[in-house]
A protein has these predicted regions:
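Helix-to-loop junction immediately C-terminal to a conserved catalytic motif
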Residues: 27-65
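Residue-level recognition of the N-termini of beta-strands and the immediately preceding loop/turn
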Residues: 40, 59, 85-88, 135-137, ...
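Glycine-rich, highly charged phosphate/nucleotide-binding loops
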Residues: 39-43, 114-124
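Short, well-ordered coil/turn elements that cap or connect secondary structure elements
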Residues: 33-36, 84, 102-104, 168
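Helix-enriched interaction subdomains in cytosolic or periplasmic regions
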Residues: 9-30
């Protein structure tokens, strides 16, 4: 709800607890093992995430927002791949008041419909970055649930934080793409891809609004490229470009179904298409997967 002029801005700070976050991550891992066949990441993606654990300084990870599971993916990645870092993420304050325990895993509440929330959120994140040099901001800059097939269009939140945080030093900004899809298991797969966001080319005289616009554009471009590259791999239904983060064991289907497949000389896992066919398909569509590291190919 938009506040009236003179009304105090509604904001709810987090009270981050590393101990509770680690405990909650155990619950999250069990949830993923129960509800999904596996969690896979495109090869090289986890290396990009893990590099943050070896770097002193804050970081920003911007992800698409298509599911209730998205923040739990962040918990899974944050606790398993970058355990030395602390974490924070914005959330609609009305929802956070319903799930107050989430404040202890780094969630803070903002009023998304109040334009004053943007500078307040930016100020809060920068202050936290100053207090905690290994802090990571996870943010869904689309600002609402959107289907993975929709073109990614961003609100300025992530760009505003990146522009402010990078005024005096360069910090890593990553794009995380997530898809939930069914292949051949009775349960869905979680598929991930990570790509670096290249800093915009800005001169020393750029205004703050120009910096925000430039950063928003670069994050949006990287997220679109990343989502498109992941979508191509999802449609190919080939597990070879992926590495397993969680689950992914053979024989995940029903035992009788697995037996039937073995009798037919097949197996329960996704059969990889020939690499030549995949490459030809991408070439015909004029699609070149974006590099994981974000460097020019």
């Amino acid at each position: 709800v938009t506040t009236r002029p003179g009304e105090q801005l509604d904001f709810l700070d987090s009270v981050y607890s590393p101990k509770l976050t680690r405990g909650f991550s155990i619950v999250v891992r069990r949830m993923f093992r129960k509800q999904f066949a596996s969690v896979h990441a495109v090869k090289g993606s986890l290396d990009v995430i893990r590099s943050l654990d070896r770097r002193l300084g804050p970081a920003i990870i911007a992800l698409n927002h298509s599911s209730w599971w998205d923040p739990l993916v962040c918990v899974l990645l944050g606790t398993s791949e970058i355990p030395s870092r602390t974490h924070m993420a914005p959330m609609d304050i009305a929802q956070l008041r319903r799930f107050k325990f989430m404040r202890k895993i780094g969630i803070f509440g903002v009023s998304p419909d109040d334009p004053r929330s943007l500078p307040r959120m930016t100020r809060h994140v920068i202050e936290r970055f100053g207090r905690e040099p290994m802090c990571t901001l996870w943010i869904t800059p689309q600002g609402e649930f959107r289907d993975v097939r929709d073109e990614i269009v961003l609100r300025p939140g992530a760009g505003a934080v990146a522009a402010r945080a990078c005024e005096k030093r360069e910090i890593p900004v990553l794009a995380l793409a997530i898809e939930y899809t069914f292949w051949e298991d009775k349960r869905p797969e979680v598929l991930l891809r990570v790509q670096r966001v290249q800093p915009p080319d800005l001169n020393d005289h750029a205004t703050r609004s120009e910096r925000i616009e430039a950063w928003t554009g670069e994050i949006e471009r990287a997220m679109r490229e990343n989502q498109s590259s992941l979508a191509q791999l999802v449609m190919e239904r080939d597990p070879r470009p992926f590495e397993i983060l969680l689950g992914g064991k053979e024989g995940a289907n029903h035992p009788l179904y697995d037996l039937w497949l073995r009798l037919r000389g097949k197996h329960g896992r996704i059969r990889a298409r020939k690499a030549e066919k995949a490459a030809a398909s991408l070439s015909q569509k004029g699609v070149s997967p974006a590099p994981i590291g974000g460097e020019p190919s």
